[in-house]
Amino acid sequence: MEKQDKLYMSIYNDFYGGLLTDYQSRLISMYYDEDMSLAEIVKECGISPQGVRDALIRAEKTLTTMESKLGLVKKTLEMKRLLLEFEKVATDEQKKEIKQALAILEE
């Protein structure tokens, strides 16, 4: 998986991780956010390599399905891009409001 794909999987987990089981969300976090290898996850969780791999695949599929149906990550990134573009031509007062909007999107 390419670096950008790994970044997106981490973002998907931030957005949709609450819809996964705690176990699946934790595995995604360990693999993508903490950059742990499968062997390290196996050791940490005490399950088989195949069990870890299967759980990761199911979680990845769930996350990508959620994004393809809801598109929240795509929409949020597009809103950020548009706000940053608008900020370039905005007045000082508008820039304050844009910064507030960007802060809300970061939450």
Positions of PLM-derived features:
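DNA major-groove recognition helix of helix-turn-helix
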Residues: 31, 56, 63, 67
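Helix-turn-helix/homeodomain-like alpha-helical modules used for DNA recognition
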Residues: 81-107
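Short Lys/Arg-enriched helix C-cap and helix-to-coil transition segments
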Residues: 64-78
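Short, Lys/Arg-enriched N-terminal segment that forms or immediately precedes the first helix
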Residues: 4-17
